[in-house]
């Protein structure tokens, strides 16, 4: 009998030890299981990141060959005037620049979109036909206090900026009153940004007329999005496209929109009071340019 009790007591000791360490064992087992589950999760996350990088590369490659997303700034007028200064008793003459933005900037655009494929990835691109109408006047220029007599109206530049000039499909011209001017590549140091086109024009008539109406058309390619800078005292944009999943972006949302399964139309109106810069910029700087860039708005052609 004593031997039986001793055997039972001996069996209780391992059982007690197991109970004491059972919680620790459970924690260790759970930790091992969690680690085993994390391994495929990390692998999946790495795969997602790699797919994301590959998609970005595919979009960049197609966009570089077709044309980048376009942001359009213009048209506007650059006027130059002589600036006389004295340095060490010597008189120096440099060139000052004044930018004059239009009183009205009305843009009507038709866009035809399509999807290009690069491997398993899709990139949205478009071809657009844009019509720009409006007018310039000297009203705001007179308010700015600049010396109109010093301005070289006979050598004014009509400036038009866009992001990627490869998207231009045909020659661009602008009609001012009854005169037509052809644009030249580059800005020749006359514009807000370095990328775009300009046309040298004799705008002496602007001093004589209260209004100088303009009209221009452009066929432009781009990818993913199109945006506009609201340079007009009143800017109105009307866009239509065969795209059913637009994402309206930028500093202003459209006042009216109509989106269906296959297309959309949208209208914006932006006043000069809605932005942080005036109709005239005298010897503009980086801060002025940043204000213009930050005021742009438009649409992103989102792939569903």
Label every PLM stretch briefly.
Residues 53, 57, 64-65, 74, ...:
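Soluble non-transmembrane domains of integral membrane proteins
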Residues 1-19:
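N-terminal Lys/Arg-rich, disordered targeting/topogenic segments
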Residues 17-18, 36, 57, 63-64, ...:
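N-terminal, polar/Ser/Thr-rich
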Residues 19-46:
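Hydrophobic alpha-helical transmembrane signal-anchor segments
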């Amino acid at each position: 009998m004593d031997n039986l009790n001793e055997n039972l007591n001996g069996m209780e000791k391992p059982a007690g030890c197991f109970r004491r360490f059972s919680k620790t064992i459970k924690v260790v087992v759970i930790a091992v299981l969690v680690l085993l589950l994390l391994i495929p999760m990390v692998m999946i996350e790495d795969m997602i990141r790699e797919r994301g990088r590959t998609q970005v590369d595919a979009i960049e490659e197609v966009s570089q060959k077709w044309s980048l997303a376009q942001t359009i700034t213009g048209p506007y007028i650059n006027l130059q005037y002589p600036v006389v200064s004295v340095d060490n008793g010597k008189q120096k003459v440099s060139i000052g620049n004044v930018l004059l933005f239009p009183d009205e900037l009305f843009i009507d655009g038709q866009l035809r979109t399509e999807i290009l494929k690069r491997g398993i990835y899709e990139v949205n691109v478009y071809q657009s036909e844009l019509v720009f109408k409006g007018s310039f006047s000297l009203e705001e220029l007179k308010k700015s206090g600049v010396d109109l007599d010093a301005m070289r109206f006979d050598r004014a530049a009509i400036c038009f900026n866009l992001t990627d000039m490869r998207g231009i499909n045909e020659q661009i011209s602008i009609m001012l009153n009854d005169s037509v001017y052809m644009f030249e590549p580059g800005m020749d140091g006359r514009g807000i940004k370095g990328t775009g086109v300009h046309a040298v024009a004799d705008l002496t008539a602007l001093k004589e007329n209260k209004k100088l109406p303009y009209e221009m058309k452009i066929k432009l390619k781009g990818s993913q999005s199109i945006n506009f800078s609201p340079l007009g005292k009143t800017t109105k944009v009307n866009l239509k496209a065969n795209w059913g999943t637009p994402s309206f972006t930028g500093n202003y949302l459209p006042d009216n929109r109509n989106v269906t399964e296959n297309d959309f139309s949208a209208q914006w109106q932006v006043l000069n009071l809605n932005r942080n810069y005036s109709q005239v910029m005298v010897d503009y700087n980086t801060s002025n340019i940043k204000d213009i860039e930050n005021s742009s708005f438009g649409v992103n052609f989102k792939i569903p």
